């Protein structure tokens, strides 16, 4: 027999004028509220301007946060979503699932991006993440972010607690993370800095503390780097060494005429502990 589908009630209060856009949408336990200055055409123009400015800054190897911020719309978005609504069921048909979601975000050309994102029991491609939290905070000079991805002891796949944070600054990004196992032991702790250079993008390992990989603390050479050059070459000089002799090295021979000469050296490293 044919299957009968009964659509749920969707209550929507939406309008857009030249000076404002407003939306209230309720469907089951899905609730969305949006208020923005300017009509929808102006909001689309903001989006195009941001994309264009990002491309321009990447091409010119710099990050001008204030310039990017000037294109942000004056907007607030509030989203509360549970498990009993048509939008969650649409996600399920695509192989995703979610117990709940909460977003409280404000954007402004003066104050930047500020807000929080909370997701619970997200399932994507068969992988379950119990808790996801992201916080964004902007001041007059920069934008900071902190967050957490955690699987509790009842997770059927992996139990861990990953904490991360970072900062967008003038010429790049700093990102740091600590990953704890089910026994609250730090298995990985790493700080990475990405910076725009005149000839490419440079990554370096560093932070307030020495990196930890596979539960071992490593020292790292002071001027370490990996440079992804505009000419498609990779240059590197990273030396990680633990007290027990475990070491990881990545280095390049930039004097060769070969398209690429990159060497990875690993000594006494137990990959199963990472």
Question: PLM features: residue spans?
Answer:
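Interface amphipathic segments
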Residues: 1-274
């Amino acid at each position: 027999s044919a299957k009968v589908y009964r659509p749920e009630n969707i209550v929507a209060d939406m309008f857009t004028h030249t000076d404002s856009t407003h939306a209230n949408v309720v469907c089951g336990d899905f609730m969305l509220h949006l208020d923005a200055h300017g009509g929808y055409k102006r909001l689309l123009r903001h989006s195009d301007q941001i994309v264009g400015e990002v491309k321009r800054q990447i091409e010119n190897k710099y990050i001008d946060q204030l310039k990017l911020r000037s294109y942000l719309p004056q907007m607030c978005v509030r989203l509360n979503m549970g498990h009993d609504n048509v939008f969650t069921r649409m996600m399920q048909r695509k192989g995703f699932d979610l117990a709940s979601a909460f977003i409280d975000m404000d954007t402004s050309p003066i104050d930047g991006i500020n807000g929080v994102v909370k997701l619970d029991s997200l399932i994507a491609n068969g992988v379950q993440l119990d808790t996801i939290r992201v916080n964004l905070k902007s001041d007059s000079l920069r934008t900071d972010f902190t967050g957490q991805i955690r699987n509790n002891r009842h997770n059927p796949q992996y139990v861990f607690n990953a904490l991360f944070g970072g900062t967008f600054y003038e010429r790049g990004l700093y990102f740091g993370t600590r990953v704890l196992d089910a026994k609250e032991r730090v298995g990985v702790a790493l700080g990475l800095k990405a910076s725009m250079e005149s000839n490419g993008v440079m990554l370096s390992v560093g932070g307030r503390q020495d990196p930890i990989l596979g539960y071992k603390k490593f020292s790292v050479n002071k001027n370490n780097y990996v440079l992804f050059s505009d000419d498609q070459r990779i240059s590197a000089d990273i030396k990680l060494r633990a007290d027990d002799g475990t070491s990881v090295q990545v280095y390049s021979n930039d004097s060769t005429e070969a398209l690429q000469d990159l060497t990875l050296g690993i000594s006494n490293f137990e990959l199963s502990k990472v």
